[in-house]
């Protein structure tokens, strides 16, 4: 064979071999796809059959008491994982709006308000991310809420450059934790101590005085809102659960932020999802008592309701901007008239207290408070069994019905002030704990609300939301902190007598926030102490006084006139029970999600016991809801995402150990 012919033959042979390889590959891929399709089809058929058998009784109903995240998540699990009919799911809420502590409301004219802000975490919110990966985004077609949040967060990474600021206005070097060997030893000893040995102990009972002067304590305390007298038990849980964040606590890189406030970004899409399936929302309806069947078990037989004035609560009254219609109606009421934009608010500060404009401002905030169903501390509380414009009703449960209750809410009894008015301190018995206390006396194993809700002077702190026309103040804060809005997370003034911190979120933070309006949020932990510059306790301060105290700590008081003229409103919010879930307690004070002996009853909140997990998080609410649904309905074809054991990860622990010696 000639050399040329051989080469041609070789080429032909290679082509034939290539054809065979491609054919074999194609056959393999087709076979694989077919097998995968058959596997998935069989799996879907099995799941569908399971669901049909599971929900053979279409008359069963589920009643959620409380309209917070836990109940909304529970309803979603019923629909998604139990094939439950939406019309058989009933969410009963005592307030006029759903969402619980996940709030966000206001307008450019009256000012915006968030009682609090939630810092999510990509590494530890296992069930939260899983659930919201199946909830459609309202902003992006074919995207989930999880994708929307994580995409936003990855494009707006957090890296605080001014985590702590001292009284001289200097940014503190927080590259070191500030521990001495005694601090390290006490911390290590705590990590090794069984939870059962920490009943009713406080943080300050465990650690020496030096520990509370360390950079670590200031950062850890203000990131999670601990007090020295908070539960040592919960502090240990946080150390175990958030050990992954220990080594980067000074930059807060682990903070995951939502595109908007959590009502707009979390509650609203979840609510819209549930509405699409016909879930029944009963707002402005207070549950006053539960009846149980006689005997040793725990079986709810009846739910006692007190309905308030009728509210037309449907998709039309809850706009896509996350503000209910009561506030929408306020949007034409400006805090400052357009004709007065040239006048500085600082020139109006010394007005007579009886000035009509001031009354107008207070009236606006009063309407905002009503829309959020927040009292001013003088109105008759909903916990006083007021019968005006209300009617009593009893729902009798059938044998297959279930009752799932949110036992306690940290934002109960919250009150608002405004630029000229301090919020009142409402230490009356909160609505959620009142019901919990009633039922805890009827059956064993339902926990005890007293350790959490009997000490409002210890469990309170105060937040404030500042709304500005333009970005003058935000630009000064940006120059001071070296962080653009949305990149710095928390900035704490460590020497502040109120222990004040602020957060400047990416703008806009509300869906109905115009581009020429900016907002930021802050809070103080020690509300009973006089300010460093304003000689009165934070809880007695107006929004203006809180802002001026802040300007002193920012060393911007010389820019006061320039800044104040652009302020639309500063709305302080006093929350008497906001730290109640951190109170020292016994192991038995928090009930199990599904108490022992329960046949149709579960409790879901920040006040139930979930081993290894930490309270004061969105994850805790979602995990509690999933446990309740999967247990009561015997869901076996899906698993609850376990708590990720970073405290047992050698690499994470080594990193944390190294950090503790810096």
Predicted regions: what is each one?
Residues 2-62, 80-86, 321, 655-661:
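Extreme N-terminal leader/targeting segments of oxidoreductases
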Residues 66-68:
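Glycine-rich Rossmann-fold phosphate-binding loop(s) that bind the pyrophosphate
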Residues 79-105:
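Glycine-rich FAD pyrophosphate-binding loop
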Residues 110-149:
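Conserved FAD-binding subdomain of flavin-dependent enzymes
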Residues 138-241:
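Rossmann-like flavin
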Residues 242-326, 372-373, 378, 384-401:
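Helical element adjacent to the flavin cofactor pocket in flavoenzyme catalytic cores
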Residues 243-258, 378, 396, 400-624, ...:
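C-terminal segments that line or cap access tunnels to active or ligand-binding sites in enzymes
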Residues 633-662:
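Active-site-proximal substrate-binding core of FAD-dependent oxidoreductases
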């Amino acid at each position: 064979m000639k050399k040329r012919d051989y080469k041609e033959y070789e080429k032909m042979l290679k082509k034939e071999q290539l054809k065979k390889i491609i054919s074999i590959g194609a056959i393999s891929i087709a076979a694989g796809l077919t097998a995968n399709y058959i596997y998935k089809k069989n799996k879907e058929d099995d799941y569908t059959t399971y669901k049909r058998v599971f929900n053979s009784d279409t008359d069963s109903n589920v009643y959620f008491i409380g309209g917070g995240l836990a109940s909304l998540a529970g309803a979603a699990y019923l629909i998604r994982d139990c094939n439950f009919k939406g019309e058989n799911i009933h969410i009963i809420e005592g307030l006029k709006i759903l969402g619980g502590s996940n709030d966000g409301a206001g307008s450019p004219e009256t000012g915006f308000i968030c009682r609090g802000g939630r810092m999510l975490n990509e590494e530890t919110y296992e069930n939260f991310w899983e659930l919201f990966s199946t909830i459609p985004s309202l902003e992006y077609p074919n995207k989930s809420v999880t994708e929307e949040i994580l995409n936003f967060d990855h494009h707006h990474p957090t890296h605080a450059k001014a985590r702590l600021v001292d009284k001289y206005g200097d940014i503190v070097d927080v590259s070191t934790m500030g521990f001495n060997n005694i601090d390290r030893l006490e911390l290590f000893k705590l990590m090794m101590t069984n939870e059962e040995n920490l009943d009713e102990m406080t943080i300050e009972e465990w650690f020496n005085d030096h520990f509370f002067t360390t950079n670590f304590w200031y950062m850890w305390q203000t990131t999670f809102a601990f007090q020295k007298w908070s539960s040592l038990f919960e502090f240990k849980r946080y150390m175990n659960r958030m050990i992954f964040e220990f080594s980067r606590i000074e930059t807060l890189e682990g903070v995951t932020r939502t595109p908007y406030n959590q009502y707009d970004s979390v509650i609203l899409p979840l609510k819209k999802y549930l509405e699409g399936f016909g879930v029944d929302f009963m707002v402005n309806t207070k549950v006053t008592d539960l009846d149980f069947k006689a005997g040793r078990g725990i079986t709810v037989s009846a739910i006692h309701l007190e309905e308030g004035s009728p509210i037309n609560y449907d998709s039309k009254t809850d706009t896509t901007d996350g503000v209910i219609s009561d506030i929408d109606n306020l949007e034409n009421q400006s805090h400052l008239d357009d004709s007065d934009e040239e006048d500085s608010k600082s020139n109006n500060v010394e007005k007579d207290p009886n000035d009509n404009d001031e009354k107008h401002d207070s009236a606006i905030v009063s309407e905002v408070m009503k829309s959020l169903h927040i009292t001013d501390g003088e109105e008759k509380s909903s916990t006083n069994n007021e019968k005006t414009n209300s009617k009593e009703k009893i729902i009798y449960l059938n044998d297959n019905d279930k009752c799932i209750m949110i036992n306690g809410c940290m934002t109960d009894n919250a009150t608002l002030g405004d630029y000229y008015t301090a919020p009142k301190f409402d230490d009356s018995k909160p609505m959620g704990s009142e019901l919990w206390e009633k039922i805890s006396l009827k059956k064993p194993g339902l926990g005890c609300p007293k350790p959490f809700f009997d000490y409002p002077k210890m469990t309170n702190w105060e937040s404030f939301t500042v709304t500005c026309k333009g970005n003058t103040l935000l630009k000064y804060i940006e120059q001071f902190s070296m962080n653009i809005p949305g990149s710095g997370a928390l900035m704490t003034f460590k020497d502040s007598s109120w222990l004040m911190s602020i957060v400047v979120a990416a703008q806009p933070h509300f869906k109905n926030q115009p581009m020429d309006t900016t907002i930021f949020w802050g809070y103080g932990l020690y509300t009973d102490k006089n300010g460093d510059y304003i000689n009165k306790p934070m809880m007695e301060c107006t929004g203006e006084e809180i802002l001026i105290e802040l300007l002193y700590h920012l060393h911007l008081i010389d820019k006061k006139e320039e800044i104040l003229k652009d302020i639309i409103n500063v709305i302080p919010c006093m929350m008497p029970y906001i730290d109640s879930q951190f109170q020292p307690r016994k192991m038995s004070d928090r009930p199990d999600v599904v108490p022992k002996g329960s046949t149709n009853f579960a409790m879901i909140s920040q006040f139930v016991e979930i081993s290894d997990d930490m309270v004061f998080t969105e994850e805790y609410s979602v995990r509690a809801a999933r446990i309740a649904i999967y247990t009561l309905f015997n869901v076996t074809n899906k698993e609850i995402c376990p708590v990720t054991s970073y405290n047992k990860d050698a690499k994470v622990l080594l990193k944390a150990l190294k950090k503790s010696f810096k």
